[in-house]
Amino acid sequence: MSRPALNTFISSITLGALALAVPPAQAAEPSAKDIMEKVTVTRKLDGSEAVVKMTVTDDKKQSRERDITMATKLYDGGKTEKRIYRFLSPADVQGTSVLVFDYETKSDDVWIYLPALRKTRRIVSSQKSQSFMGSEFSYGDLNIPAIDDFDYAMSKQEPFGGETCYVIDVTPKSKDVAESEGYSKKTYWVSKDKFTVMRGLFYDKDGKLLKELVTGNIKLLDAKNKRYRPMHMEMINKQNGRRSVFDSSKVTFAPSTKDEYFTTAYLERS
């Protein structure tokens, strides 16, 4: 081998060794807002149907159970999720139904049908902080919040529920959003692997801890698009001692869910 060729060969080996010696740059962590945007995407399914048992426990540890059927479907290229909840039992709530149009960039539309009155009532934005059918969940808690209505900050990473989680503080950008939600701040523990909320803390308008959300039994329902849903959600009111649990069963990924389910006409069917 000639000297120039030998020098080139040695230089190539040296550069290769240096490249191996330098550790690869670690991928930058996503921003807090990016994480919450991913959470929003991850919970959306093209369509789904489920049976839900809602258990409401008061401060004296007395519980009431309600059986619900639920269906969801995406519209407008995924920018709108429509949901319907229909109460099957007990008798005092049988036939009550709730229809939600959950929009990505504007205030949601919510209607509730009360069979005793044979009347459908629209729930306005200022009522979103009200209790969902006597539970510790509000109507707003069950909806997907508009991402641009909030500021986001990641405080740390820590384990929760068997998952390594990002811990993210979420604060409303305006008084109107805060009043509509009923919270001055929320803190979420978000799984780094599944991008689902594992835990949430909700603070009232005075900054005092109001409620804690804990989720579990996370299921992969759409493997192709990596869409997850918690089968268990528990909301604990830290100020009055009440708690409510949603346990989902018979959950199916169903893109062909009927469009007629998501109409006020269907809402009023017995």
Identify the residue ranges that each predicted region occupies.
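N-terminal mature ectodomain segment of secretory-pathway/periplasmic proteins
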Residues: 30-116, 153
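Gly/Pro-enriched, hydrophobic low-complexity segments
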Residues: 99-101, 109-113, 119-123, 128-145, ...
